[in-house]
Amino acid sequence: MARAGARGLLGGRRPPGLRLALALRLALLLARPPSGRAGAPEAQGPAAPGTTAPEGGDRCRGYYDVMGQWDPPFNCSSGAYSFCCGTCGYRFCCHDGPRRLDQSRCSNYDTPAWVQTGRPPARARDTAAPRDPGRERSHTAVYAVCGVAALLVLAGIGARLGLERAHSPRARRTVTRALTELLKQPGPQEPLPPTLGPPLGGCVQVQMGDGLPRGSPHNSADKKRLNNAPRGSAAPGPPRGPRLQGGGSLTLQPDYAKYATFKAAALKAAEAAPRDFCQRFPALEPSPRQPPARAPRPSPDLPAPLDACPWAPPVYAPPAAPGPYAAWTSSRPARPAPLSHPTARAFQVPRRPGHAARRQFSVKMPETFNPQLPGLYGSAGRGSRYLRTNSKTEVTV
């Protein structure tokens, strides 16, 4: 319009003052800065110091913060804090008007692209692969072959164990035990072996019971009697005083094992010390009847059976004994040569009532009581052989 007026003025004849005013106005219009682009956010400008907050306070719009979280809108209407201040990513209420935030310049009102992750793409292995029938058949064949092989291995192991058990030493041991039981059956009665050696030459006698058989070689007519027992008939009588344990029930067996046992026992007794021999034969219980203070002396024409044994060597001398026996034997001279057994057997003295001849037998030393003379097994060079008991009295029953 101004231009049209200017053209009219230029086209017509106008005064010079009007032309000058129009030129100044055009210069002012050209010197004015542009107001800005359309749709662009307005820049925050400093507010005038006298700027007042809108009625009811300023309102902060909702926005997405730097963490991608949505912050809802809020009003700044708390007293003096009536202005929305801060930045686009962090907003708060303040009382300073010049620090007011121009919210039109911010663009974080929509969901950021980096927040929308979405669903990850499906992997290839998640998709079902097509089934191969040929491959499945091959797997089935492998399983069947392995099962059959395992069954065959188990069957072989079982057969091997059965054969080993059938031929094991336990089965052979059972057969051997049966054969041993058959061989242990008792055989025919055999005579006893010969005596185990020369007599020991001692005067030790051990009385046994009457349970020995009649046909025993140790029960012959020339058996030895007790030293202090009267000579008379051999009729058995009731036992008087205690006997050696196990003597009444001992019977001779022809078994070789028992013979070997007797032989070993005799050899051990012969080699043992006198103290061991005394411990082997326990002492008998004392008789309830007390002996007289002094025994009656026999007649001089009778031999003294207590001085020396008939089968003892010539150099044997009986040991001294305390008591009445020592007093009686000390007054008698030692006999240089004892009478032989048949001669000693010929003498008969009246026996005391209740006494009877007992059969003599030794389990450990059967040779001691055999009717053998001292010269049968000994010689002048070897010397006398007799068993020393290392005691004051002889062991008699």
Swiss-Prot record:
Positions with biased composition (Basic and acidic residues)? 123-136
- Extracellular side: which ranges? 39-138
Chain intervals for the UniProt region annotation (Disordered): 117-136, 182-250, 281-303
Transmembrane segment boundaries: 139-159
Q: What GO terms describe the biological role, i.e. biological process, of this protein?
A: regulation of short-term neuronal synaptic plasticity
Enumerate the glycosylated residues.
75
Keyword Transmembrane present in the record's keywords: the answer is yes
Top-rank taxon of the source lineage equals Eukaryota
Q: What membrane topology was assigned to this protein in its record?
A: Single-pass type I membrane protein
State its location(s).
Membrane
Biological role stated in the UniProt entry: May regulate trafficking and current kinetics of AMPA-type glutamate receptor (AMPAR) at synapses.
- Can you name this protein? Protein shisa-8
Which organism is this entry from? Homo sapiens (Human)
